[in-house]
Curated annotation (Swiss-Prot):
Source species of the chain: Escherichia coli O139:H28 (strain E24377A / ETEC)
Pathway of action: Cofactor biosynthesis; pyridoxine 5'-phosphate biosynthesis; pyridoxine 5'-phosphate from D-erythrose 4-phosphate: step 2/5
Stated name of the protein: Erythronate-4-phosphate dehydrogenase
Molecular functions per Gene Ontology: 4-phosphoerythronate dehydrogenase activity; NAD binding; protein dimerization activity
Alphabetical list of InterPro entries matching this protein: D-isomer_2_OHA_DH_cat_dom, D-isomer_DH_CS, D-isomer_DH_CS1, D-isomer_DH_NAD-bd, Erythronate-4-P_DHase, Erythronate-4-P_DHase_dimer, NAD(P)-bd_dom_sf, PdxB_dimer_sf
Primary location group: cytoplasm
Length: 378
């Protein structure tokens, strides 16, 4: 049994070798000759999986170690009798922590408290729900918009997108990309929406590039609209609009979900799905794969305020470390993918062990996802 895996899937060789012969290959472009004798294909979002790639190939199963699936033609796979699995929620925590890192940086730069802001969350799936929960731990008001969930009668106080645009100081997108249909998200943030945002609003896109109309956004910024912008995803990736990058406050190369934990979850989820598919079901404990974190432990004295939270968050991950490299190489062919391929190891907040002498600080940090304990000062 031959299993092709994307060379940038951590732990893929280690895990899938339990099931058969493993061949690690580039994801973009994928070497199609390797598909001629392969039984399974494990990809990331950079690989377009469709009839033109797999027609006439012996592939029986495709797994994507990503939450999103718009790079996979699921309808054709089903028609072709090819098994499929994604990794929903695998990188949700990472994306939430990316958003926090960005917001805390902007808050420090511009001198505002997040408690004074209302956050509109568009798309309330694995990422949106977790983001809402962490914001509410800190007492930050959130507004939710998710028409599919609202129409299904899912639990939640869902509002219209127009209401979020009217009332939110921060608008952050966490939707799939639907190019048509009743829940179309292609250019959901179009020129009309962007122009309607509150003066001084913050716009964040960490889902799919085409959810925000990049041309319209650049037009509005060029005309001087007072707007802070955080973009992790871009229309036309791996190409991007260099002029837009120059205008945004934070620009990164589609790495919001790139924690070691998130990548490992993606790999283990598709590994478990494939092992079940072939009748050799196996389960993997994530903590048996992950290395010890860079920071063993730190001590926090006193209560948790926004500047202290910012220091803790940026100790684990400061979004500016990914903004600067992209600006240096933007526009050079191949460099966008190279930044992603050679991405420095990044951990989640749970990797940081925080000893607090303040009980309320320890409680808040635990609810936020840190590994925190309370030890009263002596």
């Amino acid at each position: 049994m031959k299993i092709l895996v994307d060379e940038n899937m951590p732990y893929a060789r280690e895990l899938f070798s339990r099931l058969g012969e493993v061949k690690a290959v580039p994801g973009r472009p994928i070497p199609v000759v390797q598909l001629d004798d392969a039984d399974a294909l494990m990809v990331r979002s950079v690989t377009k999986v469709n009839e033109s790639l797999l027609a006439g190939k012996p592939i029986k199963f495709v797994g994507t170690a990503t939450a999103g699936t718009d790079h996979v033609d699921e309808v054709w796979l089903k028609q072709a009798g090819i098994g499929f699995s994604a990794a929903p929620g695998c990188n949700a925590i990472a994306v939430v922590e990316y958003v926090f890192s960005s917001l805390l940086m902007l808050a420090e730069r511009d001198g505002f408290s997040l408690h004074e802001r209302t956050v509109g969350i568009v798309g309330v799936g694995n990422v949106g729900r977790r983001l809402q929960a962490r914001l509410e731990v800190l007492g930050i008001k959130t507004l939710l918009c998710d028409p599919p969930r609202a129409d299904r009668g899912d639990e939640g106080d869902f509002r219209s997108l127009d209401e979020l645009v009217q009332h939110a100081d921060i608008l952050t997108f966490h939707t799939p990309l639907f190019k048509d249909g009743p829940y179309k998200t292609l250019h959901l943030a179009d020129e009309k929406l962007i122009r309607s945002l509150k003066p001084g609003a913050i716009l964040i896109n960490a889902c799919r590039g085409a959810v925000v109309d990049n041309t319209a956004l650049l037009t509005c910024l060029n005309e001087g609209q007072k707007l802070s912008v955080v973009l992790d995803v871009w229309e036309g990736e791996p190409e991007l609009n260099v002029e837009l990058l120059k205008k945004v406050d934070i620009g990164t190369p589609h790495i919001a979900g790139y924690t070691l934990e998130g990548k490992a979850r993606g790999t283990t989820q598709v590994f478990e799905a494939y092992s079940k598919f072939i009748g050799h079901e196996q389960h993997v404990a994530l903590d048996t794969l992950l290395p010890a974190p860079e920071f063993g432990r730190i001590t926090l004295h006193g209560p948790l305020d926004q500047p202290t939270l910012k220091r803790l968050v940026h100790l684990v991950y400061d979004v500016r470390r990914d903004d600067a490299p992209l600006r240096k190489v933007a526009g050079i062919p191949g460099e966008f993918d190279k930044l992603r391929k050679n991405y420095l190891e990044r951990r989640e907040w749970s990797s940081l062990y925080v000893i607090c002498d303040d009980a309320s600080a320890a409680s808040l940090l635990c609810k936020l996802g840190f590994n925190a304990v309370h030890h009263p000062a002596r």
